[in-house]
C-alpha cells in the first residue's frame, strides 16, 4: 500500500494508485493486512466465487495481469481468467499493474456494514477512458461490480453501450441504468443482504461514480452532495454517558472496587485456563 502511495506521486502514469490505496485502506485492518497476502486474497476468491474480494475487483478494473507459474512454465492471465484456471500445483508469483494516461479516470466504492474491519456487501470500480478533445465522450469503459453473485464480474453490455457516447447526459445515463439493471446477476448469498438491496446498491454506485467524475460546473447544486465521500467530510462521532450517585443513599449504589479487582489488573489472578491439563480431563459448557 505504501508503494502505491509513493508511486502515485512520483510517476504521472500511476496517478490512479492513490485511489487504490484509499480503497485498500478499507480492507480488514492493519494487523490482518500485515499477515495476509495478495495471492491469498485472490485464492480465496478463486475457491469461493461469491467472496467480494476488493483486490480482485481493483485488479480486474485496471487491467492488471497475474503471472502464474506451473513447474517449468508460466502463464499471464487476467484476474477474470484466473477464476476459471485450475490452480493445482500452480503459484501466483507476480502482479503486473499497467500505467494509465491522464485520459483514464478511476473511481471505486466499498459498501460495508461497519466503517472498518468488514467485508464488502457490495463493491464496485469503474475505469473510463475519455476523449482528449471531447471530455465527456467515453472511448472505453470497464465496469466491475462484486458482492452480487459468483457469476457476475463485468457489466459488458453497459460497457459497450457507453462507448462513443456523452456519458454525462441524462438520456445516456437513463439508458445505461436500464441496460445495467437488465444484465446484473444477483443471487442469494448466505449471511449477506437481500438480492433486491444489493441490486439497487449496484445501480446507485454506478450513478454515484458518474457524479464523482462529472465536471462540477455541469452538475446542478442539489446533485453535488451525491458525490460526497462522507468518510472524508463528516467528523468522527462521539458520545458519553455519566452515571451520578447520591451519597445520601450510600452504601446503596456506592462505587466500590470488587474484591478481585487488584489481582486481575496486576495479572496475578489465577483462572481455570491457567491450570495444567489433567489426565482424563473433560470440558463442558453451560448452554
Briefly describe each language-model feature range.
Residues 1-252, 258-261:
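C-terminal structural segment of proteins
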Residues 160-161, 283-287:
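Short, well-ordered beta-strand elements within core beta-sheets of diverse protein domains
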Residues 242-279, 285:
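Short acidic-hydrophobic catalytic motif
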Amino acid at each position: 500500500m505504501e508503494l502505491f502511495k509513493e508511486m502515485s506521486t512520483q510517476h504521472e502514469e500511476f496517478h490512479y494508485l492513490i485511489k487504490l490505496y484509499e480503497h485498500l485502506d478499507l480492507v480488514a485492518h492493519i494487523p490482518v493486512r500485515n499477515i495476509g497476502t495478495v495471492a491469498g486474497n485472490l485464492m480465496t476468491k478463486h475457491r469461493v466465487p461469491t467472496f467480494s474480494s476488493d483486490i480482485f475487483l481493483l485488479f480486474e478494473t485496471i487491467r492488471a495481469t497475474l503471472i502464474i507459474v506451473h513447474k517449468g512454465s508460466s502463464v499471464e492471465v487476467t484476474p477474470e481468467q484466473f477464476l476459471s484456471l485450475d490452480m493445482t500445483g500452480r503459484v501466483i508469483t507476480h502482479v503486473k499493474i499497467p500505467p494509465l494516461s491522464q485520459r483514464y479516470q478511476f473511481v471505486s466504492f466499498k459498501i460495508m456494514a461497519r466503517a472498518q474491519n468488514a467485508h464488502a456487501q457490495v463493491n464496485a470500480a469503474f475505469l473510463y477512458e475519455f476523449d482528449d478533445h471531447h471530455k465527456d465522450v467515453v472511448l472505453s469503459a470497464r465496469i466491475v461490480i462484486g458482492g452480487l453473485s459468483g457469476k457476475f464480474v463485468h457489466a459488458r453490455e453497459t460497457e459497450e453501450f457507453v462507448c462513443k457516447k456523452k456519458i454525462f447526459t441524462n438520456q445516456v445515463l437513463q439508458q445505461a441504468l436500464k441496460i445495467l439493471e437488465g444484465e446484473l446477476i444477483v443471487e442469494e448469498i448466505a449471511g449477506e443482504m437481500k438480492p433486491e438491496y444489493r441490486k439497487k446498491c449496484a445501480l446507485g454506485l454506478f450513478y454515484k461514480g458518474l457524479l464523482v467524475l462529472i465536471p462540477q460546473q455541469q452538475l446542478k447544486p442539489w446533485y453535488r452532495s451525491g458525490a460526497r465521500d462522507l468518510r472524508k467530510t463528516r467528523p468522527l462521532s462521539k458520545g458519553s454517558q455519566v452515571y451520578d450517585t447520591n451519597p445520601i443513599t450510600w452504601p446503596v449504589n456506592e462505587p466500590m472496587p470488587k474484591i478481585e479487582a487488584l489481582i486481575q489488573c496486576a495479572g496475578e489472578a489465577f483462572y481455570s485456563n491457567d491450570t495444567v491439563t489433567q489426565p482424563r480431563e473433560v470440558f463442558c459448557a453451560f448452554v
